[in-house]
């Protein structure tokens, strides 16, 4: 069972019968059924033996279910960390990033969220549990299954490429798949000439081995897989494998496509089985809220965790009641915030959801409580329709409450995209919400044109909106409006934008770098 840690869940039930179900599944050796169940009991010694089997290689097809105890805190945090990586991959794929670009973005995040190339049992345990937890989250519909399989398969490819050649061989051998059996050294020697002639071009163009002696040296160490040619029909058509007696000979460096197809096929089958066993978790009122939260696509943006303790502080000395209207600051606002600011400027008022969304955003970028009251009072009273007395009576408390200065003194955080999308859609006279979801294509297209996006770029953004990928649409706009400047972000930083404040933070960071470069250029020119 899960241990309670730092959390107390009300209305706990007796789960002894549930444990019996799990044990019976495991006792009869029904690993397909057991794969779907994470809650189970085992001694620490049994757990060590099991993980010794699970972790024979640094990479896994996740064939066996995890056992043993983890806390609810681990359950949630491990799943969220893995989900961050998968959503980043999904976002990169939707934005047509190249494989090399995705690897550059993802690899550093492994070290922070999901350490992989390590001997640590705890890290491997986290990898294993988080994968199975997310199976429970994303087995519930065909669309969710397809997204999960696509992202996990790409993650598998990146990890495989990070292994050494020795570890790759060890992993393939551990799979014990009929299709993935290496030929003997004797058979390789017998077919050496034909095999080298077939793969020489691939060694040059795929592995950049331009010298003949380099290719021959690599070939001497390379292992080959023999399998029915119909399993690699695409490679056969491109003449990338040697054929003999109905069998194709596949070099180890080309086996990844075969492995990833096998991984994706197995995972999809297991997700369907997981869905069939999902009703067994309906009695567990501790897990369902977490699973429902995760399966909605929820993720905690890096901004939330990194800046959680700074929301009530002035993190940018230049942020005050006047500067938030300035071109320098407002040019970094995402479209949703620009819309709110325009609505406030036009009407000298915002309705409740609009006030909350904008107030907490401004708090997040560093607007202090005193400056916030100054900002809102000036905005509401500027046209003379509202007196200062009415503002203090009807609105002052609410804005102070957002800063934790009234009521229960809760330090509210800025809304992320998930929260914004969960609120009621805006009606006539409302300015809150997400423009990528709530605006018509005509209005959104006109706005994007005013931001100097090309027609092809606008179509790309609208396509993401049509698919319901609103945060991806926003991320595309960020990249298109910042051009290649986004490459100046720190390596390993989250590129997928799922928070208005993250958009602002990234844009402001790039803006300050550009300002610094311009100052240095002026200084250098002045000294010549």
UniProtKB/Swiss-Prot annotation:
Changing residue 434 to S: Mild disruption of iron-sulfur-binding. Strong disruption of iron-sulfur-binding, leading to destabilization of the protein and preventing its purification. Changing residue 417 to S: Mild disruption of iron-sulfur-binding. Strong disruption of iron-sulfur-binding, leading to destabilization of the protein and preventing its purification. InterPro entries: DNA_primase_lsu_euk, DNA_primase_lsu_euk/arc. Keywords: 4Fe-4S, DNA replication, DNA-binding, Iron, Iron-sulfur, Metal-binding, Primosome. One of its GO terms (molecular function) is 4 iron, 4 sulfur cluster binding. Its cofactor is [4Fe-4S] cluster. It comes from the Eukaryota. GO terms for cellular component: alpha DNA polymerase:primase complex; nuclear envelope; nucleus. GO terms for biological process: DNA replication; DNA replication initiation; DNA replication, synthesis of primer; double-strand break repair. Residues 210-239 are annotated as: H-T-H-like motif. [4Fe-4S] cluster binds at residues 336, 417, 434, 474. Binds 1 [4Fe-4S] cluster. DNA primase is the polymerase that synthesizes small RNA primers for the Okazaki fragments made during discontinuous DNA replication. In a complex with DNA polymerase alpha (DNA polymerase alpha:primase) constitutes a replicative polymerase. Both primase components participate in formation of the active center, but the ATP-binding site is exclusively located on p48. Belongs to the eukaryotic-type primase large subunit family. DNA polymerase alpha:primase is a four subunit enzyme complex, which is assembled throughout the cell cycle, and consists of the two DNA polymerase subunits A POL1 and B POL12, and the DNA primase large PRI2 and small PRI1 subunits. Interacts with MCM10. This is DNA primase large subunit. The gene is PRI2.
């Amino acid at each position: 069972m899960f241990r309670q840690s730092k959390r107390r869940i009300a209305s706990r039930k007796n789960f002894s019968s549930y444990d019996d179900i799990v044990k019976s599944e495991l006792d009869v050796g029904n690993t397909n059924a057991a794969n779907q169940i994470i809650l189970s009991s085992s001694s620490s010694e049994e757990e060590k033996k099991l993980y010794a089997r699970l972790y024979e290689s640094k990479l896994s097809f996740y064939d066996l279910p995890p056992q043993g105890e983890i806390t609810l805190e681990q359950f949630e945090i491990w799943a969220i960390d893995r989900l961050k990586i998968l959503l980043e991959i999904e976002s990169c794929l939707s934005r047509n990033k190249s494989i090399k670009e995705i690897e550059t973005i993802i690899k550093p995040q492994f070290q922070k969220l999901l350490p992989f190339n390590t001997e640590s049992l705890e890290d491997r345990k986290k990898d294993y549990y988080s994968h199975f937890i997310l199976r429970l989250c994303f087995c519930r519909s065909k669309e969710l299954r397809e997204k999960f399989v696509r992202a996990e398969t790409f993650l598998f490819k990146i990890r495989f490429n990070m292994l050494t050649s020795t570890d790759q061989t060890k992993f393939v051998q551990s799979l014990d798949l009929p299709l993935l059996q290496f030929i003997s050294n004797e058979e390789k020697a017998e077919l050496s000439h034909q095999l080298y002639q077939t793969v020489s071009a691939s060694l040059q163009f795929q592995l950049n081995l331009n010298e003949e002696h380099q290719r021959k040296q690599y070939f001497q160490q390379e292992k080959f897989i023999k399998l029915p040619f119909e399993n690699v029909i695409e490679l056969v058509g491109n003449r990338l494998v040697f054929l003999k007696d109905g069998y194709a000979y596949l070099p180890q460096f080309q086996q990844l496509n075969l492995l990833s197809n096998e991984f994706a096929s197995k995972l999809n089958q297991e997700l369907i089985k997981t869905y069939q066993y999902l009703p067994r978790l309906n009695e567990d009122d501790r897990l369902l809220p977490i699973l429902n939260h995760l399966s909605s696509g929820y993720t905690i943006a890096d901004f939330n965790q990194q800046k959680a303790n700074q929301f009530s502080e002035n993190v940018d000395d230049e942020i005050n009641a006047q500067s938030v209207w300035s071109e320098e600051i407002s040019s970094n606002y995402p479209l949703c915030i620009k819309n709110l600011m325009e609505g406030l400027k036009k009407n000298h008022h915002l309705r409740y959801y609009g006030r909350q969304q904008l107030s907490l955003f401004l708090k997040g970028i560093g607007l202090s409580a005193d400056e916030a009251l100054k900002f809102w009072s000036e905005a509401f009273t500027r046209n003379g329709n509202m007196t200062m007395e009415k503002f203090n009576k009807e609105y002052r408390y609410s804005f102070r409450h957002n800063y934790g200065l009234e009521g229960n003194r809760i330090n509210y955080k800025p809304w992320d995209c998930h929260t914004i999308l969960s609120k009621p859609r805006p009606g006539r006279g409302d300015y809150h919400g997400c423009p990528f979801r709530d605006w018509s294509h005509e209005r959104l297209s006109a706005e994007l044109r005013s931001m100097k996006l090309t027609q092809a770029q606008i179509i790309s953004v609208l396509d993401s909106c049509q698919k319901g990928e609103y945060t991806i649409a926003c991320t595309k706009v960020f990249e298109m409006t910042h051009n290649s400047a986004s490459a100046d972000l720190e390596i390993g930083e989250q590129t997928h934008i799922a928070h208005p404040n993250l958009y602002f933070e990234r844009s402001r960071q790039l803006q300050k770098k550009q300002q610094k470069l311009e100052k240095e250029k002026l200084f250098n020119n002045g000294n010549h």
